[in-house]
A protein has these predicted regions:
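Intrinsic-disorder/low-complexity peptide segments enriched for small residues
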Residues: 79, 113-114, 129, 139
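A conserved amphipathic helix/loop scaffold
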Residues: 96, 123
């Protein structure tokens, strides 16, 4: 188990801010570039993306669907694409492009609202969406 984990990288400071003492395991050498302190101030960081996901789960408008809604796969035949519905009092579509190359998908119905997007834009023409490499979307469908 020791080989799988290193001390939490809280800051870019000594021992990554994990301890003032000597840590049992060596700190990952990337701690000056990747740490909680930097992730907190970067609106596009993985940490802040997870905060957005948690906020969506807690949002009273979407909680019923996100927490208790039925999960239905969508576009299972597509390579490097994960897509599924959450259906409850609303219909949400979660789509993740797991490759560097763009992928185009056709939404099954009109996009009512973009709830989460890890890119600053979304290329939408009618019901056709062009996903950037590694783009993740959560959209509410009409």
């Amino acid at each position: 188990r020791d080989n799988a984990r290193t001390p939490m990288q809280w800051t870019g400071g000594e021992n990554a801010g994990f301890t003032a003492g000597t840590p049992w395991l060596r700190v990952n050498p990337n701690y000056t570039a990747i740490n909680v302190e930097k992730e907190t101030i970067d609106p596009n960081s993985v940490l802040n993306f997870y905060k957005k996901l948690i906020a969506l789960r807690k949002d009273p408008e979407y909680k019923e669907t996100v927490v208790y809604g039925a999960l239905e796969p969508f576009m299972e035949d597509r390579h490097n694409l994960m897509a599924y519905y959450r259906k409850g009092d609303k219909t949400l579509l979660v789509v993740g492009n797991y490759q560097w190359e763009e992928q185009e998908i056709t939404l099954p119905s009109e996009c009512k609202k973009v709830l989460i997007n890890n890119y600053p834009d979304m290329v939408l023409e009618g019901n056709s969406v062009k996903l950037h490499g590694y783009q993740v979307l959560v959209v509410e469908l009409a």
